[in-house]
Amino acid sequence: MAKKAIDSRIPSLIRNGVQTKQRSIFVIVGDRARNQLPNLHYLMMSADLKMNKSVLWAYKKKLLGFTSHRKKRENKIKKEIKRGTREVNEMDPFESFISNQNIRYVYYKESEKILGNTYGMCILQDFEALTPNLLARTIETVEGGGIVVILLKSMSSLKQLYTMTMDVHARYRTEAHGDVVARFNERFILSLGSNPNCLVVDDELNVLPLSGAKNVKPLPPKEDDELPPKQLELQELKESLEDVQPAGSLVSLSKTVNQAHAILSFIDAISEKTLNFTVALTAGRGRGKSAALGISIAAAVSHGYSNIFVTSPSPENLKTLFEFIFKGFDALGYQEHIDYDIIQSTNPDFNKAIVRVDIKRDHRQTIQYIVPQDHQVLGQAELVVIDEAAAIPLPIVKNLLGPYLVFMASTINGYEGTGRSLSLKLIQQLRNQNNTSGRESTQTAVVSRDNKEKDSHLHSQSRQLREISLDEPIRYAPGDPIEKWLNKLLCLDVTLIKNPRFATRGTPHPSQCNLFVVNRDTLFSYHPVSENFLEKMMALYVSSHYKNSPNDLQLMSDAPAHKLFVLLPPIDPKDGGRIPDPLCVIQIALEGEISKESVRNSLSRGQRAGGDLIPWLISQQFQDEEFASLSGARIVRIATNPEYASMGYGSRAIELLRDYFEGKFTDMSEDVRPKDYSIKRVSDKELAKTNLLKDDVKLRDAKTLPPLLLKLSEQPPHYLHYLGVSYGLTQSLHKFWKNNSFVPVYLRQTANDLTGEHTCVMLNVLEGRESNWLVEFAKDFRKRFLSLLSYDFHKFTAVQALSVIESSKKAQDLSDDEKHDNKELTRTHLDDIFSPFDLKRLDSYSNNLLDYHVIGDMIPMLALLYFGDKMGDSVKLSSVQSAILLAIGLQRKNIDTIAKELNLPSNQTIAMFAKIMRKMSQYFRQLLSQSIEETLPNIKDDAIAEMDGEEIKNYNAAEALDQMEEDLEEAGSEAVQAMREKQKELINSLNLDKYAINDNSEEWAESQKSLEIAAKAKGVVSLKTGKKRTTEKAEDIYRQEMKAMKKPRKSKKAAN
């Protein structure tokens, strides 16, 4: 194969990077891109033999035509030699490269394991599986002078990536919104052109026009004696500490001045031996946090600390920390096996990571790794070190704090960006505690072991805090272009800037601010104005309470169902039409419009599709097939500038958003057609005409781009039924959504792993839409929430739980029905719940005749009746009384706990509780009185009625006499009627057979003529009978009846 001279710009870029300790990026396009990897690695190593040779190769599932298993590769070579397809010692450069170099292969899904490691070269294949998180996580592991290589498949134009379907897009699609636009890919490709250390080449190393480093020139050789000012300062610091031990030996290990000062701060805290003290170290990636912690642990050992515990999300992340512990030991003169022993984990998941170090030089000392959840083993701890605290859930980090020295390190803007959450929440709480203790007493500097008895009570509730930050990178040189490019691309290092106009003139009233729709095509077009506005939006996200990650940027840009809105102050004409800084950013996701068939299939299988969080969740929780067919918008994020928080801007943005979707800004005239504000996509015809070597990839013309911001009247809204939100429940956030008329319908029973908060879903029905379904959902939610308060929601404060219950009642105000079927308690229901003995006990307790524990079994039911609105308005409790009843009755907390929670004395809490029971006892007594009263006749006392102001009629004798006569006449007629009916019954009971006429047809025939005449004349006819009947006398009838009565008496006597 003929050799070809490579472009001189390629070795120039690599050598410049090695010389200046800056990284380089190569994007190789082509199916044979892997064959150029050995060449690039060789150029890097030839520039400086001291360079890190190790290689990180990250991929999705399969490597590019080879296996990472050494034995499998050897077996394959043996088979090929047997077949005769290759010579015995034949090996191409690529095979030699993967066989001889130290390559760490890692799946993208397992890339967390590489945190804390450093490599000289990073190879990323399977571009379609790349995400912003993966880019930041892998690129940050490369040291200064190293190379990042991105491998792309063959294509005729890089613009094909604009329309490329990424793996993550599958999660963005929903049933109603499936058209994904890869805006992030376009912005990524355009950003390569502005990266001065990036070359885009084909698989034959021809430099393509897009390359940002296409004009690179070799730097003049660097003189060996030449040192930058920072290094000179560090050298002076090390020399000044040579006589101070052990600080001098340990600081000599530091790489930057920043790191040296951090180590000295740690040593100061260690030497003070202070209880309840926290040292928080925050920095970006590659600043030497783990190294500083490792050196400080070595200092703690030299100061005699016996029980040192180290924790991190995984022991594999502590590789650098333990490495520098041992470097510190070496500097202090410790020897392995003589002064200390190293114990590795036998757990296969931990990959033989170090989990324990036993030191036995002066006395027994231990450095022990613990899982973050094992905070209960810290009883004897003297020093606890938390590395990568941002990746550990906040509640767990809080549990790790105790009466001992705590060192905490966290990344504030790295691959996950979770350190912002840590700095906003945990460090802010510690800072507040520190300020509070400072106001309470001036003795806040040190609590030493000598006088700890004297001051222990003072500091039992607060921790002192010392904050350290590192800003000088160690892996690579300060001002590394790749770091700048990555921070700009993923908006990692955005900071919020105060508005100078507001400082002089004050903030505008919320009613003067307007909401605008952000056009995402323009926002992610990589134009300078758009980039500036995007950074301001992301700065609001980062400074808010949300946990941020780079992946959120791709969600914002590519997800088809997502929309962006910003609240802007009034535009000042003096600013020359400049877009003002946003006060509030809202990101929404359109959800719903799911077919009933899809819902039915998912519910029957117990599964749900991706996206459409609220529809699927509510359908699953309430087993309702109808709800998912409604269309709604979930507010994914709403971030207000913290400088102007609690000024009503967030509520104003929600109000305008609600008005927008209710159609209050829509132009209803028929002749106005809405404009199409989307940009033209790259077509197949356009791509077919291009050639990779002549591919002109550049920014879109600003004139062809749609406006960045659109008025609400310019963009017609989707027809929605409701607005919804899903967030981690905190008291302040719940208060905000409650004040904006949102109603809770779901509260997750298990807390979120990262934040420790329970996910809450709240809904708000838009005006003019059917709302009865929300009333029913809220009623069902309240019933379930009351039942679960003694289980997973037991840890809620009573005030927080009470606030949730009150917000669920707000749904009744939205109902079309004036009356609600909240059935109040009745006597029958009361008898089913409580026995007379129970009511007597309650009555005795309310009269202070019994102890609180005697009625303990009744309190849960009493609380359930009250909060279930079964007592109506008859029992009215104040807010504090309601909180006490809820805490004791539903959360099953004891009196002391609720007294401490409400900041009340215990005796006052008991007195208020007794007052609650008295009210309920009176209500039950009144209920029983009413039920008995209903069974009694209604006696009306004229004197009392006259006192009540009722009109009393005077007595009229004539009227009474007439009424009496009417009553007598009516009674007489009733008596006569009854007597007649009785006579009729007697007649009917007589035997009339003896009066029957014989059935003699001859006699009837003879008398027929006389019968017809009698019938016409309505007269009487006499018929002749065969024999004359003897007439019965009254005496005969009397004797017969008397005999009949005597016979039964005789038979009874005979029986006796």
From Swiss-Prot:
Acetyl-CoA binds at residues 638-640, 645-651, 739. It catalyses: a cytidine in 18S rRNA + acetyl-CoA + ATP + H2O = an N(4)-acetylcytidine in 18S rRNA + ADP + phosphate + CoA + H(+); a cytidine in tRNA + acetyl-CoA + ATP + H2O = an N(4)-acetylcytidine in tRNA + ADP + phosphate + CoA + H(+). Interacts with TAN1. Associates with 90S pre-ribosomal particles. It is an enzyme of class 2 (transferase). Gene3D superfamilies: 3.40.50.11040, 3.40.630.30, P-loop containing nucleotide triphosphate hydrolases. Residues 566-706 form the N-acetyltransferase domain. It comes from the Eukaryota. The modification Phosphoserine is found at residues 1001, 1007, 1010. GO terms for molecular function: 18S rRNA cytidine N-acetyltransferase activity; ATP binding; snoRNA binding; tRNA binding; tRNA N4-acetyltransferase activity. Disulfide bonds: none annotated. Its EC number is 2.3.1.-. This is RNA cytidine acetyltransferase. ATP binds at residues 286-295, 475. InterPro entries: GNAT_dom, NAT10, NAT10/TcmA_helicase, P-loop_NTPase, TmcA/NAT10/Kre33, TmcA_N, tRNA_bind_dom. RNA cytidine acetyltransferase with specificity toward both 18S rRNA and tRNAs. Catalyzes the formation of N(4)-acetylcytidine (ac4C) at positions 1280 and 1773 in 18S rRNA. Required for early nucleolar cleavages of precursor rRNA at sites A0, A1 and A2 during 18S rRNA synthesis. Catalyzes the formation of ac4C at position 12 in serine and leucine tRNAs. Requires the tRNA-binding adapter protein TAN1 for full tRNA acetyltransferase activity but not for 18S rRNA acetylation. One of its GO terms (cellular component) is preribosome, small subunit precursor. Residues 449-463 have a biased composition (Basic and acidic residues). One of its GO terms (biological process) is ribosomal small subunit biogenesis. Residues 433-463 are annotated as: Disordered. It is found in: Nucleus, Nucleolus. Pfam families: GNAT_acetyltr_2, NAT10_TcmA_helicase, TmcA_N, tRNA_bind_2. Residues 433-446 have a biased composition (Polar residues). Keywords: Acyltransferase, ATP-binding, Nucleotide-binding, Nucleus, Phosphoprotein, rRNA processing, Transferase, tRNA processing. Belongs to the RNA cytidine acetyltransferase family. NAT10 subfamily. The lineage of its organism: Eukaryota, Fungi, Dikarya, Ascomycota, Saccharomycotina. Disruption phenotype: Leads to a strong inhibition of 18S rRNA synthesis. Deletion results in an altered alkali-soluble beta-glucan phenotype. Heterozygous mutants show haploinsufficiency in K1 killer toxin resistance.
